């Protein structure tokens, strides 16, 4: 099955503490989760690893959120949008459902 949300898509968060935030998808995980730039920042406690020269301490990083909690952002309408698929010239393409424009 083709993915409706892919890496480098601009998305908007629909639910959770970061609702309304926009960001670029940096990674799509196989378990149905996505990592979005600047969204769901968590603080991890890292142990020092002297062999690799890593210092320990608190590290801020993005945590994965469920793909159902994000929607692709349509720059023409400035709103969240749904994604559809269709064939054009023998190729499967994604399009915005609100204005039928190819992504």
UniProtKB/Swiss-Prot annotation:
One of its GO terms (molecular function) is structural constituent of ribosome. One of its GO terms (biological process) is translation. SUPFAM superfamilies: Translation proteins SH3-like domain. SMART domains: KOW. The keyword ATP-binding does not apply. InterPro entries: KOW, Rib_uL2_dom2, Ribosomal_uL24, Ribosomal_uL24_CS, Ribosomal_uL24_KOW, Translation_prot_SH3-like_sf. One of its GO terms (cellular component) is ribonucleoprotein complex. Keywords: Ribonucleoprotein, Ribosomal protein, RNA-binding, rRNA-binding. The keyword Ribonucleoprotein applies. One of two assembly initiator proteins, it binds directly to the 5'-end of the 23S rRNA, where it nucleates assembly of the 50S subunit. Part of the 50S ribosomal subunit. Belongs to the universal ribosomal protein uL24 family. This is Large ribosomal subunit protein uL24. It comes from Actinobacillus succinogenes (strain ATCC 55618 / DSM 22257 / CCUG 43843 / 130Z). The gene is rplX.
């Amino acid at each position: 099955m083709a993915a409706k949300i892919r890496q480098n898509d601009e998305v908007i968060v629909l639910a959770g503490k970061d609702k309304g935030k926009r960001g670029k998808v940096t990674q799509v995980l196989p378990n149905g989760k996505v990592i979005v730039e600047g969204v769901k920042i968590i603080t991890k406690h890292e142990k020092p690893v002297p062999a690799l020269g890593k210092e320990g301490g608190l590290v801020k990083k993005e945590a994965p959120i469920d793909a159902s909690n994000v929607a692709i952002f349509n720059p023409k309408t400035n709103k969240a949008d749904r994604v559809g698929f269709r064939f054009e010239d023998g190729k499967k393409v994604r399009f915005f459902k609100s204005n039928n424009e190819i992504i």
